[in-house]
Amino acid sequence: MWIRPVSDRPNEELSPLERCYADAIEPAVLDVVELGLLEHRPHLHQRENWLIDPTRRWRRLGTLLAERAVLDRFVSPEAELWAGDSNSSHGISDRVTLEQAELSGESLRFICVLRAYLAVQLVNDSWKSRIAFEYGGVEYNLAVTDPTYNAPRDGLTRARVELGRTYLTVSLGEPFHGFCYKLVAAIVEAP
């Protein structure tokens, strides 16, 4: 079961203190985490939302190996990443209408692509990344929110890097001007 931990704040974002272990370290991608949950807080466009218990510290139980045999067990069945794609001014198949998101039933997918292209650039004094890939016969170019991949690689200030077999956690974001944007929340490069 996939969950999206949320807070009781109006935007439901987690504070740095709420999303770290007792030693103040934030979880890494592939960490297996135990956390306190108070109640299911679904939205029609994000049904995986669960309210965390802010009084309980998160605990790392272990880390999954970044190996195909392990990761493939968690891959979502191959299908398009939500029906009714449309393109924004910066992306390809990177958004769906709020109505389509509400009909989808899920807002988190863990997928595997054979090849992806990561583009990193400095925009208004902050690093922004997008990732382009093909999945289920559809081309995508999505914004990346994984902090590990929102920084320059190899000292370049603007880079386009080809990634081989890659696992992506794709999420539908909050509604914005009638659309929910598809975001890549985590990237795992397979060995």
In which residue ranges do the predicted regions lie?
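OB-fold/S1-family single-stranded nucleic acid-binding modules
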Residues: E26-D31, G36-L114, W127-P191
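N-terminal ordered "arm"
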Residues: M1-D31, L35
